[in-house]
Structure formats: structure tokens, C-alpha cells
Amino acid sequence: MIPLKKANKPNFENQNHGAGGGIPILKTMWEKFGFSFLFSSIDKHSGLSAWKLVFAYVSGLVSNSRSVNKIAEHCSKSPIIREILGGTTISQSALSRFFSKDFDWLQSSLMRVKSFCSSSPETAICDGDVVALDDTKIEHPYGKKMPFLCWLFDNSEKKHLWCMNLVSTLLVRGNGLVTPLSWRIWVQDKENKSKSKRTKLDLAKEMLLSLRKVSSAKLWVSMDRWFLCKDFFQWLNSNDYDWVTKCKRNTALYQLRGSDWNGKSRYSPVNPGKLLAIVYNKLIETGKAGQIASVSIPDIYIKLPEMEPNKKGKLVKKQVYTPVAAVATIRLPEDMDNQRVAIDIADPDEKAAHFKGAYLLISNRVDAPEQAVIAYAKRWKIEVFYRNSKQELGLTACHSQTKMAHEAHIEMIFIAETLLNYINWEVNKDGAITLTHGEMIREIINASHRVSYRNTLHLYFDTSCIKFARFIKRFWPKYYDLGLGRMPYHLLDATA
């Protein structure tokens, strides 16, 4: 006997329609960059290969599923994902147990960058590309006793909160392709809050050194003013990185004032805000409305530490006047964003030097101030990356009590963003179609679809065929089964 209440409910056990119609395109990119091989060394879990579990998790993140239970439900309801996974239904417990296992996700992150950046010339790292360095706070209000959480001040929320402090790097290429690189979790010493086991500068050095295992190209490091540290600048110079950052209002700068009667150069302290006031009228006359304008200020120096021998021949650290490129800028992308907070309320000294909307950039490239401005403007891409990850991929949605699960969740988001950014770049690079990150996910990847089984498997999109036909035909996979290689199974007709 079937209860009347249950009989009145529709039965969708074998439904042939659902969301995620563009997941096969995500699978094409996954196979193009060989991401399955990154997890080939992991043993099967619950009868499933590790790369299938990872792909299922990434597909769930793209569908904006905010929990492991929702991800498992999405994978079981989407007919095309079931076909890609070989008809296997993934349970919530299988995902939870797999991503709570001990695994070196930091090494996996490095292998992801190597695999992606070595696959084709368009994804390669070249001279002049920009590495954006920044951190963000991932709030966890109910996890005060978790050892990897910190009690920090959030400028956007204007309050202190318990959070996980994520430090990461992002690559912005000259062709416009954006790729998330490495990440680290900064841990604060809760007994002595003024100290930590490792500083964020140490984590930044570690990530930039790992990037040297992938490429030896001459790169820019574009960073927020929080990373303004003289020792860090010297470290970047010694590791063949160019750098650019915003100047703080209390940064000690010096201007060359000629030389004395012995021919020795004379320097006088100069306030960054006063430098901006001097060139402000010239600055607002340059450039066009809504575009970045800049004016280079010559003969600006900063004291950087260097090891030099003293009279006894012993190496000691001395502060040496070093020329820097000082550029007054206005209308930077980050300054034109209304959601951005202009002042650090927790530490007023961290406020950027400014004058009527103009800011001062400093860089080691004295010979190329224009390139320094372009490199710093690209730093805004990492802010957009954080925003997209939180709003569309659920960066703040992991509530596990183990650090391993959080590390796995972060790496899954970085994998998803690597693939999504490449797809978005392919869609927009010709200029015929202009889609934002969210529009691309909604109109292509998460488009509604219906599967029809005949001699071959047909898939019908609920999206604009004419707009995306060429793109879908180009990147539609030949085979639906996800494996280490291309498996000769049923064909997917690219008839959109």
C-alpha cells in the first residue's frame, strides 16, 4: 500500500532534464589541461576514482551548491553529470570522507599551475606578466576554538570577526587571461596575538619561490600597501621580480636636491601627500574622463637595507638611498569601486597617501613608470577573484571543523576558477560576445538541458543557440566518460 501523501508527489527518479548543460565544456577544459592526472595517485574512494570525486565537487561549486549535501544532490539530479561520472551516484558521505582525508593540497596546487601553464602558448607565463598578491578574510563566526582561525578586523564589515586569513597570488597575462596560482592560510598565535608562527610576508615569499619552479620569466608583483616592507622589496629584487605598490601616508621618501661641495648627493625628506599636491593640477589635465591618468615624479629615493662591509671588514646592514619610480595616479579601478573602504579604521597609519582622489605608486622600475601603473591596475583582478569566489562559488560556505577539509575546499575553488576564467576568456577574446563571470556561468555552464537517449546521446540546451553555437561546437567533447584519457564511448553531438 502506497500512502496517499507520497502518491501525490511527482517521481523524478530517472529525470532526463536539469541544470548544468554546459558541464561537458568544463570537462573538455579539464581534459585539455590534464587535471585528472593530478589525482591519479590517490586510491579509489567508495568505488570512485579520485578525479571523478574532484570533478563532481567542482561541478557542484559552479552550480552554487553551498554544502556537500547540496553538491551530492546536484550531481545525482543533473543527467549530464551522471553520464560524465559513468552513471554513478555520489553520496554526501563519500564526498565528506574523501575531502577530510590527509592530502597535500598545497603540492596539488603547484602541480595544477604547472599543468595549466605548460599546456599551450596562450597559457604560458611570459615576461611582463603580473602576479597580484593579496589576502582576504573568510568569516567563521561559530568556530572560535578552531586553531587555524584568527580574531581580525575587517575593513569592509567595520568590525572584528573570527575568520580564516587566506593569502594568495593570481596571474594576469598580457593577453588578458587570468589564472589563480597559489594560496596559503595565515595562522595567528592566539596566546600572543602580536606574533604569529609565520608572517604573511613569509607566506608570500614561499608562494613566489614555488612559482619559480614553474617559470623563470621576469614578472611583476603588484601588491596592496599592507605588503609595503623594505626587506620584502629587497627579497623581490634578489629573486628577479619587479614590484609596484601604493605608498602609505607615512612612507619615508627622499628627493634628490643636488650635491654638496664634495660632490656628495644631498637628499631631503618629502611627504607623499605633498608630492601629490604639487603635481595634482598637471595630473587632472592628462588622460580622459573615466580612464587612468598618471604623472611621473623624478628624483625620488627610498632607503633600502643592504649588507655592506664596515671599516673592520665585517658585513653590516646599512640603509642605502635607492631610486624608485614615483608615479601620481588617479582613477585607478580599486578607487572607483564604491564597495571599497578608503581608510583602515583599525590602523590609521596604514591609510594610503592621497590628495583629492590621487594616489602615489612606487616601484623599483625607475626606467618604466608607465608599465608600473599598468601593472598595479591589474592588481584589481585579484579583488574581483575574491568577490566572485565568495558570491558565486561559496568560498565562505565550508563549515567543516578540520583544516584539511578547508584546504581541500579552497583548492577546489581555485581549480574551478582556473577553468571558468579560461572559458570566459575564450568566449570574450574575439570581442563578439561580452559576458561577465556570472553571466557566463548562468548562460553556458549552468544552462538548463534535456538528455535524449537514442543510438547516441543527444543534449538540448535551454540557452541562446545563435550566440554560443560556434563556441559550443568548438569545445564540445567527443566522449562523455571522464577518465585519464579520451575514452571511446558514446558520442555527444555538437548540434547547438
Whereabouts are the PLM-identified features?
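Active-site-proximal, Lys/Arg-enriched surface segment
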Residues: 96-177
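Short, conserved catalytic/metal-binding motifs centered on acidic residues
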Residues: 56-57, 71, 91, 95, ...
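Short, solvent-exposed helix-loop connector elements
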Residues: 38-45, 369-376, 388-408, 427-430
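Domain-level cores of phosphate- or acyl-group-handling catalytic modules
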Residues: 191-264
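Basic, short loop/linker segments at the boundary and entry of helix-turn-helix/winged-helix-like folds
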Residues: 13-56, 194-198
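Electropositive, glycine- and tryptophan-enriched low-complexity nucleic-acid-binding patches
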Residues: 155-218, 336-360, 367
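Basic, amphipathic alpha-helical segments enriched in Lys/Arg and hydrophobic/aromatic residues
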Residues: 397-452
